[in-house]
């Protein structure tokens, strides 16, 4: 900077010294006011606090995930159980009706045994036909007659009324059937009442 420029600058500064002074005072006052009205600075959490919060959030997320998995499994179990119950209701829904009709079948069998073929052949034929129609109707609903004469005794399907020695029959075989049994699908709704042979 030349000497002339320095002098001009000094002169300019001196002339405007008062203005700068006033301006600086105003700026300082504004700065003081702003600093008084400023909100306190937000505190930033520490690294360890953030780490703890993250750990807690991860634990909560894991717990919620486990709960949702358990809820889904329970829902699937309920769905399967309901499907099984509906299938069983369709399969075994007629069980009470069949059980109520079995005494009618028993009565028809007894009437057939008592009816004499020779004295009234048409009545005997009518009873046989009625019995056949009845058993065919039961078969349509997956009902099967259990007539175990000569078979080995099965406690799942037979009810032993008594035991008797039978020389011509193998031991533990059915020698007499008092009342035939019935199965609905694979479920025994009435076991056959039988006499079983002994040694």
UniProtKB/Swiss-Prot annotation:
A cellular component term, taken from the record's GO annotations: cytosol
Keyword Kinase: no
SS bond list: none
CDD domains according to UniProt: GrpE (cd00446)
InterPro entries in UniProt: GrpE, GrpE_coiled_coil, GrpE_head
One biological process term in Gene Ontology: protein folding
Keyword terms: Chaperone, Cytoplasm, Stress response
GO MF annotation terms: adenyl-nucleotide exchange factor activity; protein homodimerization activity; protein-folding chaperone binding; unfolded protein binding
Cellular localization per UniProt: Cytoplasm
Cited HAMAP family: GrpE
Function according to Swiss-Prot or TrEMBL: Participates actively in the response to hyperosmotic and heat shock by preventing the aggregation of stress-denatured proteins, in association with DnaK and GrpE. It is the nucleotide exchange factor for DnaK and may function as a thermosensor. Unfolded proteins bind initially to DnaJ; upon interaction with the DnaJ-bound protein, DnaK hydrolyzes its bound ATP, resulting in the formation of a stable complex. GrpE releases ADP from DnaK; ATP binding to DnaK triggers the release of the substrate protein, thus completing the reaction cycle.
Family membership noted in the UniProt record: Belongs to the GrpE family.
Assembly: Homodimer.
Protein name: Protein GrpE
Lineage, uppermost ranks: Bacteria, Pseudomonadati, Pseudomonadota, Gammaproteobacteria, Legionellales
Gene that this polypeptide is encoded by: grpE
């Amino acid at each position: 900077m030349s000497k002339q420029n320095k002098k001009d600058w000094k002169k300019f500064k001196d002339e405007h010294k008062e203005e700068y002074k006033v301006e600086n005072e105003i700026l300082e006052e504004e700065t003081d006011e702003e600093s008084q009205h400023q909100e306190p600075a937000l505190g930033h959490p520490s690294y360890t606090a953030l780490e703890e919060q993250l750990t807690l959030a991860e634990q909560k997320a894991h717990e919620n995930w486990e709960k949702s998995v358990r809820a889904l499994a329970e829902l699937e179990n309920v769905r399967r159980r309901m499907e099984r119950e509906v299938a069983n209701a369709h399969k075994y829904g007629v069980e009470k009706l069949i059980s109520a009709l079995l005494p009618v079948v028993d009565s028809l069998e007894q009437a057939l045994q008592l009816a004499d073929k020779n004295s009234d052949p048409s009545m005997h034929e009518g009873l046989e036909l009625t019995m056949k129609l009845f058993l065919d109707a039961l078969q349509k609903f997956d009902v099967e007659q259990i007539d175990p004469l000569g078979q080995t005794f099965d406690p799942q399907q037979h009810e032993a009324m008594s035991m008797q020695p039978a020389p011509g029959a193998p031991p533990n075989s059915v020698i007499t059937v008092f009342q035939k049994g019935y199965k609905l699908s694979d479920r025994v709704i009435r076991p056959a009442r039988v006499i079983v042979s002994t040694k």
